[in-house]
Amino acid sequence: SNVGKSSLINRLCNRKNLARVSATPGKTATINFFRVDTAYFVDLPGYGYAKVSNADRERWDELINSYFEADRALNVLVQLLDSRHAPSADDVQMMEYLHFHRIPFVVALTKADKLKKSEMTAQLEEFRITCAPYGCKQVFLTSAEKGTGVEELRQYLDACLAPEA
């Protein structure tokens, strides 16, 4: 929660208010679909820290599970993680889930603007090492606020969405 999912969607789509942004963790409580050209960006509730009841958290878990288990083609999932912190047990559990269900995914490390230059390389390497065993295709260092890494992520997503020749 509160890693900047909605902010990154807005930045990727070049739209300021496409996804609702809040400073309070846990505000995304439903699955939100955003159609951009021929693709859908899907903003899911976060699975980490949020001041919500256990009942709400269980409902979010069911919602997310039902979304992933539905019979639909997912080109790629972008797991957003806060670049300032090491991957949590919840982060790794999500990677295990994605790997087990053969859902192709990449990791976008958010809030890179909050890191010192010297920390960026170290964090990127730590996350690459952590994510690799779970089939993570790539790790991107991003900042929705400054635009860092957004174009690289956008190009990767465009390539994933391109029709196969």
Regions from the PLM with identified roles:
Residues 25-28, 33-35, 40, 68-74, ...:
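Conserved catalytic network of the ASCE P-loop NTPase/AAA+ motor domain
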Residues 114-165:
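Canonical P-loop GTPase G-domain recognition
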